[in-house]
A protein has these predicted regions:
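Beta-strand-centric surfaces of beta-sandwich/beta-rich domains
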Residues: 1-119, 125-229
Length: 229
């Protein structure tokens, strides 16, 4: 009840003791959100952990009037030999969302451009109580479009990671267009307050448009990286 979500990362420490950000993220260590299912990498793939990498876990708590103990656990499985493929976790977000009060179906969007060819394996959308649906459309370099995933009934309590039946080739220059739908009306029984306009924020009474997805570059140019928005 208290743990809202966990964001795991690995990286290195900034040698400058006066730096605003001491921890420099380099890759994803996964995470947790209500109802999230386990993510499985394809055979002969993994995430590259550099020598002397540090782990960071951002724990987000929401109070509910009772003292409790966090029993979160983290498990790491190591390959006995170097895998063939490097899975890369990418996170994108729209920090400028503005959802009007008393609005039944409001849309917001965000785009991500693939800078090199990659195989897309999984997608995980994240919103709060006003999030109701999302669509993921690939816009290929030739201008053609393809609906990769439609989530018609998003539920904050079941934030699922969607594994594609077959990985999808994202050509260099392909745009992943994400459309999120929000219900800020009194008809949404989970809505904390339909009378107020809502913007991006960390608390559940705020809102978010975030997407986490996993992909393997067709040609590995450098070790796994974690792209910050």
């Amino acid at each position: 009840q208290a743990l809202h979500h966990v964001i795991g990362m690995f990286g290195k420490m900034n040698p400058d003791p006066d730096a605003r950000r001491r921890f420099i993220p380099m890759g994803s260590m996964g995470g947790y959100a209500p109802g999230t299912n386990a993510g499985f990498y394809p055979d002969d793939s993994g995430t590259f952990l550099p020598k002397d990498a540090k782990f960071s876990f951002q724990m987000h708590y929401t109070s509910f009037g009772k003292a409790v103990i966090d029993e979160t656990q983290v498990g790491v499985w190591l390959h006995k030999k170097k895998p063939k493929n490097m899975m890369q976790g990418t996170f994108i977000a729209n920090y400028d969302i503005k959802i009007p009060a008393n609005t039944k179906r409001h849309t917001e969007s965000k785009e991500y451009t693939f800078e090199r060819e990659a195989l897309l394996y999984s997608v995980l959308p994240h919103s709060h109580f006003r999030g109701i649906a999302s669509d993921f459309v690939a816009i290929y370099p030739d201008g053609s479009r393809e609906m990769l995933l439609s989530v018609p009934n998003y539920d904050f309590n079941w934030q699922l990671r969607y594994e594609l039946v077959e990985p999808k080739l994202m050509l260099k220059g392909t745009v992943l267009h994400v459309i999120a739908y929000f219900d800020n009306s009194a008809g949404n029984i989970a809505n904390p307050d339909p009378t107020v306009a809502v913007e991006y924020g960390d608390q559940t009474w705020d809102e978010m448009l975030q997407v986490f997805f996993g992909a393997i570059p067709v040609e590995i140019v450098k070790p796994c990286t974690f792209k910050l928005p």
